Amino acid sequence: MCASLNEVKKNETYGVSQKGYNDNFSESEGVLHGSKSMPTSMKNMLQSPTMVNMCDILQNKEAANDEKPVIPTTDTATAGTGTEDISSTQSEETDQNSHLIASEILEGTFKDISYKEYANFLGNDNNNQVLTEFVKLLSPLPSSLLETLFNLSKSIYFIAEAQNIDRILECLSKEWIACHPNTHWKSGYKSCHIVLFSLLILNSDLHNNFQVDHKKIKFSMVAFINNTLRALREENEYEELKIYSREHLIIEELSEYYKTLNETPLPLCTESRTSINTSDNQSSLKRFSTLGSREFSTSNLRSVNSNSTTLYSRDGQVSVREMSAKSNKNFHNNHPMDALYLKESFDDGLITENGSSWFMDDLILISKKSLPRKYSKRDKDQVAAPKMTSKRNKSFFGWLKPSKTTTLIEHTSRRTSLSYLNKDSEWERVKIQVKEGRIFIFKIKPDVKDIIQSSETDSATIDYFKDISSSYFAYSLLEAEAHVVQDNIIIGSGAMKSNVCNKNTKRKSGNFTVSFPENINGPKLVLEFQTRSVEEAHKFMDCINFWAGRISPVPLTQFEAVSNAEYGWSDKILTEHASLNLKNIVVSEWKPLLGLELLYEDAKDVEMVELKERLKELMNFTRQLGIWIDKHNEIKDKLVEIWSFDDNYFEAVMNNWNSRYLYMNNQYKKRLSYLKALQKAMGSVQF
């Protein structure tokens, strides 16, 4: 049978046989042998890049491409009568056919090849026009590079040879710069290309559980930022465009990307496209502060060194938080609990007012994966989670290999704090009370149907909820912080926006998280709750941040303490470096101090102050911290000048600078949350 006209036109457009995708390698190129579960076309893959060789791969890409054999394309007639008209007509037809093929690939209806070969097809040298049309169909691209990468991963089955994916990312970078010319990246599409490349490496490192021959811990936020910055600095346009002058903005942006990607891995598109949006929520990502605002999600830098954002520690074992050991012991034994704040006259009239900054009580839902299991009254509540491998995969594209599930979210959702972003998340009914500096959680038994609605705090009511609960907990809100999930979600464009809006409009529920920092007794913990409305989620957030801000002292010690260690910016270094032998200087690793307020959950040594005084302290502290952040920014150029004589010294000092910068920004964000909550509460107080 003869091929259809459309098929002929498509073949003329991409000019390459389907079996030719893997024929571009020379025998000398390294190959990564796929597993038996991989498609036949994927069994021999180009050795994938890693964080270590990322710069070399990007720099040598053009030379490598020159060595590849040229795939013949269909000749274009240019001789005879009407040559220009013929060429013009054929060019127009080619553009139309390229657009047609790109549209079908985006829709998953291009049948000439398997949908699993789409990325290889687009990245082929001879199909640049189709690739360009495909990327244009993704426009307008989001202002976040990570969200742009998410959109791409949802639009195409992103398993392909390394050089083909690299070409796709390069084209995507150019289109992103065209859409967003006024960012701190200026016209530097090569720099954006490096960031996209680095994000793929990070995704593989954080979420790929394939076995490797050696065991290493996963990249920390600081390591990811420093590796990416190193690659950027080696890119000529980075210097030519003077992008480095706004490097602190890039650090903030990369830190946001790390936190989001750590929580939500890149999705894997399927042929049916039914799992592209995975509960419509993959089109929703956290808001990124790409313009350098200090308003970005908080995360204690010390907890960044652990990949655990929930109850799970780095090795994957269940690690139940012990920060509230004393509260829990007293709570379970019906003993009085120590006061965490200085009670004032106005507190009596507000402490039982449900829905206020002083008191929140309701039956809501908690994400099952984040629910603590300690102090369970039934053995079935004490089952440990399966052990997860922490081996690091050195393959950049390891995440692209087929898994047993339709999306990579399935195996990693247990470690994310945002169950809102996963349609398969399981939720448990809980009774929640937030009062007097603590949050009380009662996990309701599944067989309990009729529950007495009561917000009383007397012992009889508490005993009733203990009886109908399989487990219950009490947590101090010292240094805790709450966020409404919907406040940190941005909606994509087009159909994705419609899907998300329709779904959220229908259910009208709200979600909020409560983060407890790492302390001497355990790692960072994030609990996620779901309420009947976003308004109620905001009320819980205000109440939690009010009490956290009221009982948490400002961390002046972290910034006022003088250390004998040299981090690279002591007064002596900054003023006398010309007369010093810098090679004899011992540069120590900068780490934030673990304050006394985090050593004990019910610390009696923590000074209790009046509400007005705490508010004043927070106002002064945030103002002073802003000054310290500005001063820290001011010394960066000087540090670059002083330490550029040696790569090792330079890297150590810049690592320290980045670590301290991130820590200060995180503290700034948290204290602003406290300040806002206290100011709102003060409006209802009569002095």
Swiss-Prot record:
GO biological process, one term: regulation of ARF protein signal transduction
Superkingdom of the source species: Eukaryota
Compartmental location: Cytoplasm; Cell membrane; Bud neck; Bud tip
Alphabetic keyword roster: Cell membrane, Cytoplasm, Guanine-nucleotide releasing factor, Membrane, Phosphoprotein
Segments for region (Disordered): 63-97
Biased composition (Low complexity): 73-83
Domain SEC7: 57-264
Topology class, membrane: Peripheral membrane protein
InterPro entries given in the database record: PH_GEF_YEL1, Sec7_C_sf, Sec7_dom, Sec7_dom_sf
GO cellular component: cellular bud neck; cellular bud tip; cytoplasm; plasma membrane
Keyword Phosphoprotein: yes
PTM annotation (Phosphothreonine): residues: T290
Domain named PH: residues: 412-551
Keyword Cytoplasm among record annotations: yes
Molecular function per GO: guanyl-nucleotide exchange factor activity
Modified residues (Phosphoserine): S293, S299
Known function: Guanine nucleotide exchange factor for ARF3 required for localization of ARF3 to the bud neck and tip and involved in actin patch polarization.
Family as reported in the entry's similarity comment: Belongs to the YEL1 family.
PANTHER family in UniProt: GUANYL-NUCLEOTIDE EXCHANGE FACTOR
Entry protein name: Guanine-nucleotide exchange factor YEL1
This protein's encoding gene: YEL1
